[in-house]
């Protein structure tokens, strides 16, 4: 289940590696599917507000993504880590083409990125260049995947998983792992906001990484 997969993100697990071609009709143990991918037409309302949003589609998807990611972590955090899950403090949107934005005590002019700010427990993203580029290249769920990765960094801090001096590559791969566990939850049909097929939908997300 989810707990076992999450454990694999943080520890070495026993087992035998199996080729992805072992069963051509399954992907990671899930049936190969070509159904819809993206925001559900009857998606639940977002639980988070986005600061400095322009009210556009990209910020809508980002806000829904964080709401959904937090729904997931709320349901599994205490099963896997000490303490209770606490949502990030705020969500911040900016336009990297503008000169007057700030994130994590720094200017957002030219900041084509999405990130978790440890200093104030916020997650932010560039709606001017980054999010539109992600959507155009790999679909709406590319935004969700990138933000799931950033939320993985929030989980690392919350659960105190990495000691000072942990190699950046290790922390980034662990955040990727956390994002992958969330996306599997979506692919299994558990998300009240998004769907993800294991054909082109999943392939597009892997291309985003």
Model-derived features with residue positions:
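An active-site-proximal "capping" alpha-helix that borders the catalytic cofactor pocket
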Residues: 74, 169-185
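Short pre-active-site segment immediately N-terminal to the catalytic Zn-binding motif
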Residues: 128-145, 163-169
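Catalytic zinc-binding patch centered on the HExxH motif and its immediate surroundings
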Residues: 16-17, 95-124
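C-terminal motif of bacterial Sec signal peptides marking the signal peptidase cleavage site
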Residues: 5-8
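Long, well-structured alpha-helical subdomains associated
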Residues: 186-209
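A metal-dependent hydrolase signature that marks the N-terminal structural subdomain at the beginning
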Residues: 10-103
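Active-site metal-coordination segments of metallo-dependent hydrolases
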Residues: 56-59, 161-176
């Amino acid at each position: 289940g989810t707990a076992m997969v999450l454990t694999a993100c943080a520890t070495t697990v026993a087992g035998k590696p199996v080729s992805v071609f072992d069963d051509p009709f399954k992907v990671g143990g899930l049936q190969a599917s070509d159904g819809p991918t993206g925001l559900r037409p009857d998606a639940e309302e977002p639980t988070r507000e986005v600061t400095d949003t322009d009210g556009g589609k990209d910020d809508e998807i980002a806000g829904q993504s964080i709401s959904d990611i937090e729904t997931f972590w709320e349901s599994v955090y205490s099963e896997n880590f000490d303490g209770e899950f606490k949502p990030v403090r705020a969500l911040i949107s900016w336009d990297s083409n503008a000169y007057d934005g700030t994130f994590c005590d720094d200017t957002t002019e030219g900041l084509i990125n999405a990130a978790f700010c440890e200093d104030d427990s916020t997650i932010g993203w560039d709606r001017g260049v980054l999010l539109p580029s992600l959507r155009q290249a790999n679909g709406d769920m590319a935004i969700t995947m990138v933000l799931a990765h950033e939320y993985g960094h929030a989980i690392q801090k919350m659960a105190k998983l990495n000691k000072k001096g942990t190699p950046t590559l290790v922390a980034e791969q662990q955040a990727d792992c956390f994002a992958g566990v969330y996306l599997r939850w979506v692919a299994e049909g558990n998300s009240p906001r998004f769907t993800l097929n294991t054909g082109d939908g999943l392939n597009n997300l892997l291309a985003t990484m």
